[in-house]
Curated annotation (Swiss-Prot):
The organism's taxonomic lineage, starting at the top: Bacteria, Pseudomonadati, Pseudomonadota, Alphaproteobacteria, Rhodobacterales
Chemical reaction(s) catalysed: orotidine 5'-phosphate + H(+) = UMP + CO2
GO BP annotation list: 'de novo' pyrimidine nucleobase biosynthetic process; 'de novo' UMP biosynthetic process
SUPFAM superfamilies linked to this entry: Ribulose-phoshate binding barrel
Its job: Catalyzes the decarboxylation of orotidine 5'-monophosphate (OMP) to uridine 5'-monophosphate (UMP).
The protein, known as: Orotidine 5'-phosphate decarboxylase
Gene: pyrF
Single GO term (MF): orotidine-5'-phosphate decarboxylase activity
Enzyme class, first EC level, given as a word: lyase
Metabolic or biological pathway: Pyrimidine metabolism; UMP biosynthesis via de novo pathway; UMP from orotate: step 2/2
Top-level taxonomic group: Bacteria
Subunit structure: Homodimer.
Length: 240
């Protein structure tokens, strides 16, 4: 079986032991995994290395780095020694540029976070983020990140089609969390879509956590999502 690496499963579990056990249950159904901050102190980097070197999996390290340029550059240079595939940083242009410098010479894609899919306009107001429609703010941040050299962006599926239409998005990646299979509980996500809709809107990779991780049969859940991704409703637009 050849896994479809457009599906990235978020290993939202407490530690590397649990992460490896889940990956073994998923087997060849999943070839791409996301490791986030929650597992960093639980052996996350060691797990990333084992999944990559021993099991041939692709690795997305979701760090959302945000600091002064020199610090971000140094952090990315250090992390790039782990043979990662994707790494997230905040979408501010100075952060993106510094991350690209740190990743120089490595086959590491720097993905810029636009606005978290768990946030809506009320949340942004509470955080004193400038006024404006969330959709427009995401597009503005995506365009600025691309101009700064980002290899891709993290954005909700609701903005994916509009981001794909940006001139700056040509040849860049769109990776979307906030994916829920039809009928699934939304959890803490507020700007969501189904796997089929996300792919149809031009998304390159979807990130799915709880619908797989918390399923009674994670492998069956992953296979069901993969089936949605290849359904007739999931035909991506021609990008030529």
């Amino acid at each position: 079986m050849l896994a479809d690496d457009r599906l990235i499963v978020a290993l939202d579990v407490p530690n590397a032991v649990a992460g490896l056990a889940l990956a073994e249950r998923l087997g060849d159904a999943v070839s791409f995994y996301k490791i986030g901050l929650g597992m960093l102190t639980g052996g996350g980097l060691a797990l990333a290395n084992e999944l990559k070197q021993e099991h041939g999996k692709r690795i997305f390290l979701d760090m959302k780095l945000f600091d002064i340029g020199n610090t971000v550059e140094a952090a990315v240079r250090g992390l790039s020694q782990f043979d990662l595939d994707f790494l997230t940083v905040h979408g501010d242009p100075h952060v993106v540029r510094a991350a690209k410098e740190g990743a120089a010479g490595k086959d590491l894609k720097i993905l810029a976070v636009t606005i978290l899919t768990s946030l809506n306009r009320d949340d942004l107001d509470a955080s004193l983020i400038k006024p404006g429609d969330v959709h427009d703010l995401v597009l503005e941040r995506a365009a600025r990140a691309f101009e700064a050299g980002a290899d891709g962006v993290i954005a909700s599926p609701q903005e994916a089609a509009a981001i794909r239409a940006l001139p700056e998005a040509a040849g860049r990646l769109i990776v979307t969390p906030g994916i829920r299979p039809a009928g699934a509980d939304l959890g803490d996500q507020k700007r969501v879509a189904t796997p089929a809709n996300a792919i149809a809107d031009g998304v390159d990779h979807i990130v799915v956590g709880r619908p797989v991780v918390h399923a009674p049969d994670p492998r069956a859940a992953a296979l069901s999502i993969l089936a949605e991704m290849t359904s007739p409703q999931a035909v991506a637009p021609n990008r030529s």
